[in-house]
């Protein structure tokens, strides 16, 4: 199997299970899971220049613009030139995808297609610990104590945009922005779309796909 570094991207709407799939890919194949949300939180906490720029938009519940998120992610990717990685939350727009093109070639793109009703149900059951970004789902990943973060003991909250009335708008926005990104990667022959309502049913196919590109470090049973 080739020793070429693997550059992968995962796409999917809020509630599609991207975080869970990324975690399994990282565990099974040794890829670095690079989450734009995680890097944003780190930079905001550290009061970096790019963190301060992003904070202005996040506090107003606005999407962080391309030039800010691209600057942040380019810096992170520059530090990981010698690693296999999986991008989560970037690129979200065609502009971001074009910026990524300038520094590397993406080998593999996964797009998760989850029915709207499933997304609505999942998001309405989702609670988060804002300081860390830890996400819980009351159905399949509940906290040990209801409403409390497992690690810190701090209270969990439900985001306003996870409430059912906001989910439809978020999904429409995702589809509008993601469509040209999906079409771009589809035209290059690197896009693989997975549809379903359960991560556990999608996972074996994702595992097989990655196994054809990179040697697993542990068996697929290791969830």
Curated annotation (Swiss-Prot):
It holds the Pfam family ADK_lid. A ribonucleoside 5'-triphosphate binds at residues 15-20, 126, 135-136, 199. AMP binds at residues 36, 41, 62-64, 89-92, 96, 170. Keywords: Acetylation, ATP-binding, GTP-binding, Kinase, Mitochondrion, Nucleotide-binding, Transferase. One of its GO terms (cellular component) is mitochondrial matrix. GO terms for molecular function: adenylate kinase activity; ATP binding; CMP kinase activity; dCMP kinase activity; deoxyadenylate kinase activity; GTP binding; nucleoside diphosphate kinase activity; nucleoside triphosphate adenylate kinase activity. Its EC number is 2.7.4.4, 2.7.4.6. GO terms for biological process: ADP biosynthetic process; AMP metabolic process; ATP metabolic process; cellular response to hypoxia; GTP metabolic process; regulation of oxidative phosphorylation; ribonucleoside diphosphate biosynthetic process. Residues 35-64 are annotated as: NMP. Residues 125-162 are annotated as: LID. The modification N6-succinyllysine is found at residues 60, 179, 186. It is an enzyme of class 2 (transferase). It catalyses: a ribonucleoside 5'-phosphate + ATP = a ribonucleoside 5'-diphosphate + ADP; AMP + ATP = 2 ADP; GTP + AMP = GDP + ADP; CMP + ATP = CDP + ADP. It is found in: Mitochondrion matrix. It comes from the Eukaryota. Its main location: mitochondrion. The modification N6-acetyllysine is found at residues 175, 179, 186. Disulfide bonds: none annotated. Broad-specificity mitochondrial nucleoside phosphate kinase involved in cellular nucleotide homeostasis by catalyzing nucleoside-phosphate interconversions. Similar to other adenylate kinases, preferentially catalyzes the phosphorylation of the nucleoside monophosphate AMP with ATP as phosphate donor to produce ADP. Phosphorylates only AMP when using GTP as phosphate donor. In vitro, can also catalyze the phosphorylation of CMP, dAMP and dCMP and use GTP as an alternate phosphate donor. Monomer. Interacts with SLC25A5/ANT2. Consists of three domains, a large central CORE domain and two small peripheral domains, NMPbind and LID, which undergo movements during catalysis. The LID domain closes over the site of phosphoryl transfer upon GTP/ATP binding. Assembling and dissambling the active center during each catalytic cycle provides an effective means to prevent GTP/ATP hydrolysis. This is Adenylate kinase 4, mitochondrial. The lineage of its organism: Eukaryota, Metazoa, Chordata, Craniata, Vertebrata. The gene is AK4.
